[in-house]
Amino acid sequence: MILFPAIDLKDGQCVRLEQGDMARATVFNFDPAEQARAFASQGFEYLHVVDLDGAFAGRPVNADAVERMLKNVAMPVQLGGGIRDLKTVEAWLKKGITRVIIGTAAVRDPVLVKEAAKAFPGRVAVGLDARDGKVAVEGWAETSEVTALDIARRFEDAGIAAIIFTDIARDGLLKGLNLDATIALADSISIPVIASGGFASIADVKALLAPRAKKLAGAIAGRALYDGRLDPAEALALIRAARAAA
């Protein structure tokens, strides 16, 4: 199980939103590269980055901030937001991104996901963000009529590295992960699933390490890390201990 610290980018700054609402953004660091270095020094092994402006614009917007982070940390980085074509996928991977996350295009253009996964094995993930059970797109501004499971099943044999499943209703509110829905998704597909949205405390780490969550590949933590509700050292120690005992 991997715990991914999250850096969400808006106007070149590190922010957290509440329920994906750009009007409810809190700036936690004016320098995303500095925040990335802080997470690296705390012992995290994989960084999760989202270009929020890019998600709304449909193209990369905070590229400079992302590139500065890549120059400042050696750990792997997965990136989502505004990745809508094969050219953008290839460009980010060439710049040093370990894994790209395709969200809106996974709903609108599933062929793109399959082509990208074939061209770059193990380096393409799909982001499925659900509101009331239905997948939201365009930076969560629109809600589709399909479920996360419907979309995930389209990619069962496509070689997708992971599905990142976010419960929008919980995102940024520190209410705890929606493990019931996330585990149900993981149990229904063969693609590794990463939980996101609502990470609140060490209790979430313990729940992720429980037997019923054994199929989950990881989870993403944001606001809980920034406001001190989740101690990185304690969380990572629990994860290391679980790995050693496995």
From Swiss-Prot:
Its main location: cytoplasm. Pathway: Amino-acid biosynthesis; L-histidine biosynthesis; L-histidine from 5-phospho-alpha-D-ribose 1-diphosphate: step 4/9. It is found in: Cytoplasm. The keyword Methyltransferase does not apply. GO terms for molecular function: 1-(5-phosphoribosyl)-5-[(5-phosphoribosylamino)methylideneamino]imidazole-4-carboxamide isomerase activity. InterPro entries: Aldolase_TIM, His_biosynth, HisA_bact_arch, Isoase_HisA-like, Isoase_HisA-like_bact, RibuloseP-bd_barrel. The keyword Amino-acid biosynthesis applies. The active site is at D8 (proton acceptor), D129 (proton donor). GO terms for cellular component: cytoplasm. It catalyses: 1-(5-phospho-beta-D-ribosyl)-5-[(5-phospho-beta-D-ribosylamino)methylideneamino]imidazole-4-carboxamide = 5-[(5-phospho-1-deoxy-D-ribulos-1-ylimino)methylamino]-1-(5-phospho-beta-D-ribosyl)imidazole-4-carboxamide. Keywords: Amino-acid biosynthesis, Cytoplasm, Histidine biosynthesis, Isomerase. Its EC number is 5.3.1.16. Gene3D superfamilies: Aldolase class I (3.20.20.70). One of its GO terms (biological process) is L-tryptophan biosynthetic process. Pfam families: His_biosynth. Belongs to the HisA/HisF family. HAMAP family: HisA. This is 1-(5-phosphoribosyl)-5-[(5-phosphoribosylamino)methylideneamino] imidazole-4-carboxamide isomerase.
